[in-house]
């Protein structure tokens, strides 16, 4: 149902196809959360049913149209589709993204299609995955080629079930702050001093959330080992 012409927050880059898959997944989970609030708090059962009905309709469409059988990674979620068999295979660092779907509660982290998608987006098969001397991660057309968004590295850590992978992500984030002590919007894959937005509250807040999550999960030793 999400057919707006632009992509993520602040991104005026127009879509190539009509339906942005991660945003539609997010719509499904958001509609169900709204229905719960409407039912339990507002006692608006009729409106709540409209939300759950729409969520079910969009979910059915995603199951039918949002996947693609990739020759290397198996069945994955496409980034954009048009419902006529065309798929755009990529991911963008902006959240909602394919990588971030379990973080947002849109899919289970153990969903096999998600795990295939996760491997795809963190590879050279994703045209907006960049790897260089300073670090690696996903960027997007909002900033341009070779610029890694720390947000993507955070989302990899948020959705990881491997402590060593999480440790690598956090170290990379710490090593690419250009000595400023802050997360930036993006940094050049070969030179972290070439960055955009010296102060980007969204990224800084997410980094704090990631550290707090690890502390709450009893992984202080992991953090202390960095």
Regions found by a protein language model. Name each.
Residues 2-9, 13:
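Single conserved hydrophobic/aromatic residue that forms the stacking wall/gate
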Residues 14-17, 193:
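A short, mixed-charge helix-start or loop-turn motif at secondary-structure junctions
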Residues 18-29, 92-96, 145-152, 198-209:
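Aromatic- and histidine-enriched alpha-helix N-cap/loop-to-helix transition segments
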Residues 33-52:
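Inter-helical turn/loop segments and adjacent helix faces that build the functional surface
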Residues 35, 99-102, 154-155, 208:
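Conserved small-residue packing positions in alpha-helical repeats and bundles
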Residues 46-84, 105-206, 213-226:
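Non-catalytic carbohydrate-binding regions of carbohydrate-active enzymes
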Residues 86-111:
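C-terminal amphipathic alpha-helical segment
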